[in-house]
């Protein structure tokens, strides 16, 4: 079958290392009855492995040439549905299933953060997620309070999910090799986080505002939102830096604004 050219604007790096592919599938541990959604399947390297493990697989691919390639490659498969769609705009709840989705994929590095936020907005229909991401992004997601990598993505990811850094993948596992290392992460939705954010948009705004001034104290960083008299009510020291605040702290700040 004719190979498809890579498109730089889609951030395409195709995984080809069979050992890494098998390791990813083992981490996902798909079951026959699962409904899997693969984002950015490319030429189907991971898809081939997933098809042998589950009976319901959906592919979301934006590249029309790759969609045509995949349709031809899997035209005899009855357990696969291909959506030509931008994952940033895709309604994951539209996938026909009576079970929560298991979402997987080698996410394009140039859209990985906004795509994660899009998935967080649809977390109600997701059982878990396993992604290949730039190693730096995985470090930011899993960063602990007070660390250099702890920031907006860390806070929001921890609010929505329990996150586990699984393993690193070298550039040589891809064609063409990216200039950075990659890593596999597991994200399991948290449906009972406490305290509950009353307004998720407000929470996101507070976190974004705080980390826009991460070298300032949180009292100064959020002075447009929180007046000095409110900090004692929150039981948060306004002299702390944003990276020293827990997810719970940010939720409390967000909730006092509602």
From Swiss-Prot:
<keyword id="KW-0949">S-adenosyl-L-methionine</keyword>
<keyword id="KW-0698">rRNA processing</keyword>
<dbReference type="GO" id="GO:0003723">
    <property type="term" value="F:RNA binding"/>
</dbReference>
<keyword id="KW-0808">Transferase</keyword>
<feature type="binding site">
    <location>
        <position position="86"/>
    </location>
    <ligand>
        <name>S-adenosyl-L-methionine</name>
    </ligand>
</feature>
<dbReference type="InterPro" id="IPR001737">
    <property type="entry name" value="KsgA/Erm"/>
</dbReference>
<feature type="binding site">
    <location>
        <position position="40"/>
    </location>
    <ligand>
        <name>S-adenosyl-L-methionine</name>
    </ligand>
</feature>
<dbReference type="GO" id="GO:0052908">
    <property type="term" value="F:16S rRNA (adenine(1518)-N(6)/adenine(1519)-N(6))-dimethyltransferase activity"/>
</dbReference>
<dbReference type="InterPro" id="IPR020598">
    <property type="entry name" value="rRNA_Ade_methylase_Trfase_N"/>
</dbReference>
<comment type="function">
    <text>Specifically dimethylates two adjacent adenosines (A1518 and A1519) in the loop of a conserved hairpin near the 3'-end of 16S rRNA in the 30S particle. May play a critical role in biogenesis of 30S subunits.</text>
</comment>
<protein>
    <recommendedName>
        <fullName>Ribosomal RNA small subunit methyltransferase A</fullName>
        <ecNumber>2.1.1.182</ecNumber>
    </recommendedName>
</protein>
<dbReference type="GO" id="GO:0005829">
    <property type="term" value="C:cytosol"/>
</dbReference>
<feature type="binding site">
    <location>
        <position position="15"/>
    </location>
    <ligand>
        <name>S-adenosyl-L-methionine</name>
    </ligand>
</feature>
<comment type="similarity">
    <text>Belongs to the class I-like SAM-binding methyltransferase superfamily. rRNA adenine N(6)-methyltransferase family. RsmA subfamily.</text>
</comment>
<keyword id="KW-0489">Methyltransferase</keyword>
<dbReference type="Pfam" id="PF00398">
    <property type="entry name" value="RrnaAD"/>
</dbReference>
<dbReference type="InterPro" id="IPR023165">
    <property type="entry name" value="rRNA_Ade_diMease-like_C"/>
</dbReference>
<keyword id="KW-0694">RNA-binding</keyword>
<dbReference type="InterPro" id="IPR020596">
    <property type="entry name" value="rRNA_Ade_Mease_Trfase_CS"/>
</dbReference>
<dbReference type="InterPro" id="IPR011530">
    <property type="entry name" value="rRNA_adenine_dimethylase"/>
</dbReference>
<feature type="binding site">
    <location>
        <position position="106"/>
    </location>
    <ligand>
        <name>S-adenosyl-L-methionine</name>
    </ligand>
</feature>
<feature type="binding site">
    <location>
        <position position="61"/>
    </location>
    <ligand>
        <name>S-adenosyl-L-methionine</name>
    </ligand>
</feature>
<feature type="binding site">
    <location>
        <position position="13"/>
    </location>
    <ligand>
        <name>S-adenosyl-L-methionine</name>
    </ligand>
</feature>
<keyword id="KW-0963">Cytoplasm</keyword>
<dbReference type="InterPro" id="IPR029063">
    <property type="entry name" value="SAM-dependent_MTases_sf"/>
</dbReference>
């Amino acid at each position: 079958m004719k190979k498809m050219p890579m498109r730089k604007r889609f951030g395409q790096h195709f995984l080809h290392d069979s050992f890494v592919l098998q390791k990813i599938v083992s981490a996902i541990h798909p079951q026959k009855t699962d409904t899997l959604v693969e984002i950015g399947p490319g030429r189907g390297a991971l898809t081939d492995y997933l098809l042998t493990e589950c009976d319901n697989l959906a592919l979301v691919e934006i590249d029309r040439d790759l969609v045509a390639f995949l349709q031809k490659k899997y035209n005899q498969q009855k357990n696969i549905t291909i959506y030509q769609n931008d994952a940033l705009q895709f309604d994951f709840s539209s996938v026909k299933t009576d079970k929560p989705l298991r979402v997987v994929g080698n996410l394009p590095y140039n859209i990985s953060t906004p795509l994660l936020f899009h998935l967080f907005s649809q977390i109600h229909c997701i059982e878990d997620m396993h992604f290949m991401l730039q190693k730096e992004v995985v470090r930011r997601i899993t960063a602990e309070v007070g660390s250099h990598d702890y920031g907006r993505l860390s806070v929001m990811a921890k609010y929505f999910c329990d996150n586990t850094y699984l393993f690193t993948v070298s550039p040589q596992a891809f064609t063409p090799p990216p200039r950075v290392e990659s890593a596999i992460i597991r994200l399991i939705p948290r449906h009972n986080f406490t305290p509950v954010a009353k307004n998720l948009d407000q929470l996101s705004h507070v976190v974004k505002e705080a980390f826009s001034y991460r070298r300032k104290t949180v009292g100064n960083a959020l002075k447009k939102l929180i007046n000095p008299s409110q900090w004692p009510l929150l039981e948060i020291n306004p002299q702390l830096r944003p990276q020293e605040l827990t997810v719970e702290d940010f939720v409390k700040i967000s909730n006092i604004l509602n």
